[in-house]
Amino acid sequence: MASQGTKRSYEQMETGGERQNATEIRASVGRMVGGIGRFYIQMCTELKLSDYEGRLIQNSITIERMVLSAFDERRNKYLEEHPSAGKDPKKTGGPIYRRRDGKWVRELILYDKEEVRRIWRQANNGEDATAGLTHLMIWHSNLNDATYQRTRALVRTGMDPRMCSLMQGSTLPRRSGAAGAAVKGVGTMVMELIRMIKRGINDRNFWRGENGRRTRIAYERMCNILKGKFQTAAQRAMMDQVRESRNPGNAEIEDLIFLARSALILRGSVAHKSCLPACVYGLAVASGYDFEREGYSLVGIDPFRLLQNSQVFSLIRPNENPAHKSQLVWMACHSPAFEDLRVSSFIRGTRVVPRGQLSTRGVQIASNENMETMDSSTLELRSRYWAIRTRSGGNTNQQRASAGQISVQPTFSVQRNLPFERATIMAAFTGNTEGRTSDMRTEIIRMMENARPEDVSFQGRGVFELSDEKATNPIVPSFDMSNEGSYFFGDNAEEYDN
């Protein structure tokens, strides 16, 4: 890991702050989520939502999307320059669900972007509060990570669909800043780079001229972000090669895919944070909680505690299982989509089932779905224990994994061995160790072969009772290692389509 001196904690990235001490970080993160809460309350007032309607997660998502769209400078500029039929570039909106005569009805609302921006700034002491916007993007990204699999996207870039544990944050917009970069998985970064290189191969002007210079800077920056996620010297050296390449082409794509595969065993450091829907912060603010004064952390007990006493509802389709819908949202809140299911189950206190066994579709309701048959139910978002979210890959060791997902990317800092199937992973490394990166490749393969299943990651780290806010008594769970470990095992989840 890089010396702590140069690293900002993710709360600092998220709040755009320079180095702060723990109290200042807690206060600025508190200010950020408090601003989201105040904005949400104001929007509910504007839209005349009842208390129940304001607690509906689908309404929360619509309101979040409106503010993200209102502040999307690039897209707004594009929409103004390329007017398309039926799209007013100055307006934003979406479906709002209301309870009428015992039924749920959908109402499509439209708002001036300028007005939404005004309400957002007003809730955030007159500032743009980009940190809060990024926070909402990460919540949407975590929701996508829990809901969809990215098989098609992986295959398109030449990667193996079983590498889905590396794909955290793959739906985050480009403008999500440092906090967004911190939560992106190795596979996500590799995919972005491969797409860029492919464009360069197909379009000879891509790296040329004034625009090309900017492209090159973006390329090198992305390489550096990815390099920073790797924890071994050989992986980092390979990233230097990719970054310094004169004109990136197929050799670089090969190197990147090699690195992505290696990350299944030599895991990268990927940040995890609990980002909750805006309505949860709104509920807390409405009940008089002062986030800035009390302080808040995205990686400690605070989100767990907030969810313990928030009642959030969701629309449920006729044949969906409300308990499964709750699991989906719980996973989206704490971002363990690629975590070992046994760890998630232990913390949640109820069994977390693999994606393929869930009787539920995504949280968002399509505009053509019939509202007549929609019901709503309370989401069970409480947990039995809490654990600190990690930003390391928890590297030391490995062990058996499953067919649908051949590795995990730990979310919680809890002692265990990390499951993965060495035979499957190593099979991908036959042959090709020649070329400029041969010595590094050989070194990486050697490290992977020497990784021992019996070693334990996060030694001595445990989960904590919800009454133990200072994390003084770690409970180190023992896991039944014969059990299935991965969420996307044997999966038939829907694909994510933009």
Curated annotation (Swiss-Prot):
Gene Ontology molecular functions: RNA binding; structural molecule activity
Entry's family note: Belongs to the influenza viruses nucleoprotein family.
GO BP of this protein: symbiont entry into host cell; viral penetration into host nucleus
Region (Disordered): 1-21
Main subcellular localisation: virion
Reported modifications of this chain: Late in virus-infected cells, may be cleaved from a 56-kDa protein to a 53-kDa protein by a cellular caspase. This cleavage might be a marker for the onset of apoptosis in infected cells or have a specific function in virus host interaction.
Protein name according to UniProt: Nucleoprotein
Function statement: Encapsidates the negative strand viral RNA, protecting it from nucleases. The encapsidated genomic RNA is termed the ribonucleoprotein (RNP) and serves as template for transcription and replication. The RNP needs to be localized in the host nucleus to start an infectious cycle, but is too large to diffuse through the nuclear pore complex. NP comprises at least 2 nuclear localization signals that are responsible for the active RNP import into the nucleus through cellular importin alpha/beta pathway.
GO cellular component: helical viral capsid; host cell; host cell nucleus; ribonucleoprotein complex; viral nucleocapsid
Compartment annotation: Virion; Host nucleus
Residue window of motif Bipartite nuclear localization signal: 198-216
Record SUPFAM superfamilies: flu NP-like (SSF161003)
Subunit structure: Homomultimerizes to form the nucleocapsid. May bind host exportin-1/XPO1. Binds to viral genomic RNA. Protein-RNA contacts are mediated by a combination of electrostatic interactions between positively charged residues and the phosphate backbone and planar interactions between aromatic side chains and bases.
InterPro entries listed in its UniProt record: Flu_NP
Keywords from the UniProt entry: Capsid protein, Helical capsid protein, Host nucleus, Host-virus interaction, Ribonucleoprotein, RNA-binding, Viral nucleoprotein, Viral penetration into host nucleus, Virion, Virus entry into host cell
Record motif Unconventional nuclear localization signal, residues: 1-18
